[in-house]
């Protein structure tokens, strides 16, 4: 029963992309971004509707494979040895090979190939390792599939960048009768273009939070662009939702969460930093107060000792040593 199997797999597969996304941002030092990116990406209206139970579609894994490929490319760039670079390149190729089985869009292969080569170049990996890694990547995704990537990308752009209705001419009895037919993609609800506010509303109901997360992500990208390069193909698809088809909203949603997560992490780290500084400042103040008190006590005892000594001599009393010396002198005088 394929329908029953698909229905039971949806709750598991639709949220599976959270794992590689969380690992990705944990490796680059922004774990909260991975957490919120996964949560908002899962429960965004645009993706939640397309991966609901009962709707058996390829969308349930269309986020998992791109994020997994991005994670493996990131690990290839961070690898310490040439052997690990090649292993992660093979892993990225195999993940996209499986993606072709799941969702036959060869353009993904070409896009991630360019990202892999550029990321390794930015990380200053040896040219030999880049060359071998690229070869293994192409070998794993299947060379014939890779060679058809440019044609797939061209067809994709033609489908999603036609904004005007096309016209067709029909010839009847040697006469030409013009007839206008609508663009087929405009008749599909998920391929329709929606306003920018509606795009954000299908991610989070609060548009202000959407804008904050969207701008925050680009702020994060300015500082950490090298480690975010493997996510560029997925981000490009997400940005298409503003101009082309609303089906790409599901690719944009995780980036809103990533931006909000980065701001949240900055806020939490800032609060802990202020608390730590406040505690350290109090410790310094306490030590200074204790030192002054100790110094005041020492000064007080010194004053008491001086005062007692002065009072002792003022009353005509001498210390025991002085009195004994005078007595000894008197005895010696008498005996003499």
Segments (PLM) and residue ranges:
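Short, low-complexity, charge-dense intrinsically disordered segments
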Residues: 281-289, 297-303, 309-326
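Alpha-helical transmembrane segments at the extracellular/periplasmic loop-to-helix junctions
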Residues: 145-154, 161-230
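Membrane-embedded helix bundles of polyisoprenyl
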Residues: 2, 6-120, 235-238, 336
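Extracytoplasmic
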Residues: 314, 333-336
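Hydrophobic/aromatic-rich transmembrane helices and adjacent perimembrane loops
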Residues: 237-276
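Perimembrane helix-loop-helix junctions
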Residues: 78-80, 86, 108-138, 266-273, ...
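Membrane-interface helix-loop-helix junctions at transmembrane boundaries of multi-pass membrane enzymes
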Residues: 124-131, 201-233, 270, 277-280, ...
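Membrane-lumen/periplasm interface segments of specific transmembrane helices
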Residues: 99, 134-159
